């Protein structure tokens, strides 16, 4: 199947990752996946949420937002609305869960690492790109803390990355762009670690249900895409070792 942008059904969009995109963050990247662009930056604080005080355990959390003209029509800032939108809350919780799944919290001490994901251009897949980019930003932050003697070791227990898969015009397609995502019959977001385990599976039918066989095909295609993302991540993180 040839797609509108010339890709085959099993191809990711072109991906570029720029590490150290922000000078002041403990770790940061700009991830570009097709026309989708997200800045992922990490800040460390010497404190933890109330429920973790005096536990000796750290915390990783995330915030997600979109610039007003990251979208075709202006998206109102959450700050102007006076509250975080339900969509933003859902996405930032997903990002936080995904990152915590691959970190040994005890290795952080009583420190928090806050990951900010700011979408500067949205062409579908912003939440999955945020997860993939945030892993690298967090890796860079942890490496910096180890080099400074603040952390005694790298706290990661695995890699984590994410990708979207859609059923578009009856075809299962990897990493859909906006036009495909907008018209999709079914949308999936898949998060995996490099042990081949699923961290999260989100799947929603838009008017037409899907079969177990279709789900199996989606998972297989998504895993193949995520394996490619792991290799891209390693291209940034391994030179830091």
UniProtKB/Swiss-Prot annotation:
Catalytic activity: tRNA(n+1) + phosphate = tRNA(n) + a ribonucleoside 5'-diphosphate
EC number: 2.7.7.56
One Gene Ontology biological process: rRNA catabolic process
Molecular function via GO: 3'-5'-RNA exonuclease activity; tRNA binding; tRNA nucleotidyltransferase activity
Binding site for phosphate: 87, 125-127
InterPro entries: ExoRNase_PH_dom1, ExoRNase_PH_dom2, ExoRNase_PH_dom2_sf, PNPase/RNase_PH_dom_sf, Ribosomal_Su5_D2-typ_SF, RNase_PH, RNase_PH_bac-type, RNase_PH_CS
Keywords: Nucleotidyltransferase, RNA-binding, rRNA processing, Transferase, tRNA processing, tRNA-binding
Gene3D superfamilies assigned to the protein according to its UniProt record, in alphabetical order: GHMP Kinase, N-terminal domain
Superkingdom of the source species: Bacteria
NCBIfam families, per database record: RNasePH
Assembly: Homohexameric ring arranged as a trimer of dimers.
Its job: Phosphorolytic 3'-5' exoribonuclease that plays an important role in tRNA 3'-end maturation. Removes nucleotide residues following the 3'-CCA terminus of tRNAs; can also add nucleotides to the ends of RNA molecules by using nucleoside diphosphates as substrates, but this may not be physiologically important. Probably plays a role in initiation of 16S rRNA degradation (leading to ribosome degradation) during starvation.
The name this protein goes by in its record: Ribonuclease PH
